Every structure is written in structure tokens, then in C-alpha cells.
């Protein structure tokens, strides 16, 4: 197993353009609090009644991706509250091993009342006409945040990578993370360097995110997507 480490250096919260067509998060037009609430209420007409499937006989609280259903969100997670839900959409990738391609993605941020968020991402490749080609990448992990608004994200990739990210909220609708440790198994992707991620809600209340990786000593966008809420 190999390990790459990077220090937390902060950096520009903006997302540069790239072959991955990164959505612009920090440069998005501002949205007022009232407009955000009204837009969320309108979207909730189609998503508020839905939740992720669960089993009924578990003796402890089930995971929920809907703040209206299931256990109450832990008070320590209020800075991450807007992320909770199921998000689905499309994005662009530009990777050393796969080249440039389009993909579909679903991200689930859920909780069980404890002081962490569960994270799951599934990615599938798309052809030039938007049709599904097949599964591509998968991640699972946990987000935590302390009283100083310091975020910890432990992320495991199905390809044989485990990463630890640290970060902080940029504002109430955006979160920036930087990898402190990237560990790759003997059969994992040797081209995956340390990186940085940015997640944020766009003025449309869609979730945009970008993953940047160190390539030739320069951070370059690897994957990015724009996702709409389907649950929560």
C-alpha cells in the first residue's frame, strides 16, 4: 500500500474551467435567503415525501436522507444540513486512466441521528448520446464537523483507495475539502494523486461539486457534476 500526504494549504475557493467542465460554485450569482427558502419549498413538492429504502426490523434508528422523516439531525451537523438528501445528475471527467468522458451520478448524504453524515456516491459512464454504458466509480464514507467548523471526510473508493480530507465551510452553502492522506492498494489507481474537493449549492439549489487532483505539481480538475435533488 502506498501513501501520499499533502498539507492543508487552503487555496482558492473558485473552480477553474477544465476538460471536466467544472461547475462554477464560488462565482455563482448570490441568492437571497427568502429566494432560497421559496425555491426549496417549491422543489420539496416533488421530493419531501420520498426517502431511501430501509428495513423495518433494525433495533436502532435507520438512515434517512430526508430531514422531515426519521431521527432528528444531530445539532452538531447544522453546518452540513443543506447536503442531506439524494442528488442525481450528470458530469464530466478527465482522468489519466479513462480520458475525457461524460457520466451520470447519484450522491446520498444521510444520517441516523448520530454526529456524522453517511456519504455514498455511484457513478456510471454515458455515451455520446447520453445513454448508460455501465458502472464506473463508487465511493462511501463519513463526514464529521467539530465546533470550530473543521470538517473531516473519510472516503473509501471501490477501486482501492482510502482518503482522509480536512476542510471547512466557505459559507452556508459551500464546503471546501483538501486531502491530507491518500492511500492506494497494490492494485489501485497509481495515477491518483492528492487532491481537493469543493461542494456547493448553486442558485438553482442544485448541488455542484468538483474533484481536483495534483498532476505534474499542479491541481487539475478530474471530475465535476451538477446534481438535482430527488429525495429530501
Curated annotation (Swiss-Prot):
Residues 1-10 have a biased composition (Polar residues). Residues 1-33 are annotated as: Disordered. It holds the Pfam family THAP4_heme-bd. Gene3D superfamilies: 2.40.128.20. A motif (GXWXGXG) lies at residues 85-91. Belongs to the nitrobindin family. This is Ferric nitrobindin-like protein. It comes from Corynebacterium efficiens (strain DSM 44549 / YS-314 / AJ 12310 / JCM 11189 / NBRC 100395).
